[in-house]
Amino acid sequence: MDRIIVKPSGPLYGDVEINGAKNSALKIMAACSLAEGTFHLMNVPDITDVRLMSELLVSLGMTVRENDTNSLEITNPGNLTAEAPYELVEKMRASIVVLGPLLARYGKARVALPGGDDFGPRPIDMHLRGLEMLGAKFASEHGYIDGHCERLRGSRIVLEFPSVGATENIMMAAVLADGTTIIENAAREPEIADLASFLNRMGASVLGAGTSTIVIEGVEKLGAVEHAVVPDRIEAATYLAAVGIAGGEINLIGARPDHMDMLCQKVGEMGMRISADSNGLWVMANKSLKAVDLATLPYPGIATDYKPFLVAMLAVSEGVGIVTENLFSGRFRYIDELIRMGADIRTEGHHAVIRGVENLSGAPVRAHDIRAGAALVIAALRAQGQTEIREPSHIDRGYENLVENLSSLGADISREN
């Protein structure tokens, strides 16, 4: 049985180099379907989801080659097969973002309904409505979405919610549309700004990415380019939270503090010390943390991906904290696993009430998704006795070297097959 074993550990000390952002790399890889030629992508994390996206691109007709560590060479020969099969899409929800670029480039796309992490429904209606406003038409049957269009036409699109995936899909489609597209109430995440930077390198005209209004002037043709993916703020948050739980002092090399302002502010309220420099972030925790209340919100608010780490921190903090999930339903499932470890947590609808305890207790637990699995790993740093995290393959979807990095910082952690 594949499992991660964590035994009682002391404070963490040392350096961790932050990898490229999963949520940026996957979308940039999908955008390679927009133009012929050979793309060179750097700072790409070596994780399961990237390998799955590589398989998907190959199934479309591209070639993907690993050049050096964290570097991909993607060649698009043109005349791609505009179908993303169920066998690949079911494993990764992010696969849906090939829909927009395939429609824009080839006038058709057939994409299986997506799978991925299991934490409640995340409808793709906003993706489809936005693309329809650009001129696409869709039919859904037998578990597939079939789309077709003539050349897409620019339009003003107001999103009912700042959906990251919908913003990305519409943005990638609009770069080859005829005319101007304006996306209002757009998602503002750093990964969207990174995707826009990549598209602009290709010859697109995207203005305002990272703000709530994005303006795209369609162009006739794009070209292949080089690009380095931005650092992963979610990975950085994982190690930051690990220090909050176990204590210690580490440097997060390459982390972008400007992408993590709200998180840094919140953990500062809890008692952590954080400072930024040109190399990244320095984080320290040398005393018990104080409980706070927090709520997930679209960027620049507290990301829903941060929440499992913050819940794990609150589980061993002094006092009572209330966490409210405003973005996704069903994303408290990992709390049952923390309760198995001795956490005092009560859930009420979209709220979790967490009463901190001094230490957790080692127990066998299961990783339900990427971030929940990582949260269980770092929570185990503060557990008495051995903790066994089962189904760590979920963690592999988003982390390149979580076990190795924590071990290098002083954690007593290993992986067994």
Task: Give residue ranges: language-model regions.
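Short, structured segments at the rim of ligand-binding sites
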Residues: 1-417
